[in-house]
Amino acid sequence: MAELDDALYERIGALSEAGDALVEDGDYAGALEKYWQAFALLPEPRTNWEAGTWLMAAVGDTNFHQGDYEAGRDNLGHAMHFPDAIGNPFLHLRLGQCQFELGNLDRAADELMRAYMGGGPELFEDEDDKYLRFLGTRAEGIKAP
């Protein structure tokens, strides 16, 4: 896999870290602006870059936390076209949560099961119990709190 040159990688990383700090402060709009600025620096085709995976994950996670589940679904779905995204438990968790909140329960169950299989019940520990309870209604052996 090709790698970004060091200077570009550092610029992207700095913008991403700035976005992360804004998320910590609850400034989701500001964070999204930083993440998209970083994403715009990726050379085309952007889907070739591992940095694109974590940037799209950050965007989708931020969408989820701000309650913009449609954008979260769309951005996390797009993230699946980037390196090492399919099978990433966190990406599947957030995509499943967005699908759940949008009422797309079959898709939610599929994504949440992928998250559970890849990350185990520990992945759900800091999440609202409703997601694991829901998954327990769709699959045997899922222990909900």
Regions found by a protein language model. Name each.
Residues A38-L42, R73-H81, Y116-G119:
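Amphipathic alpha-helical segments of tetratricopeptide repeats
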Residues F39, F100-L123:
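TPR/TPR-like (Sel1-like) alpha-helical repeat modules
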Residues Y28-A29, Y69, L105:
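TPR-repeat structural position
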Residues A2-D5, L42-W49, M80-A85, E122:
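Flexible helix-coil transition and linker loops at the boundaries of alpha-helical arrays
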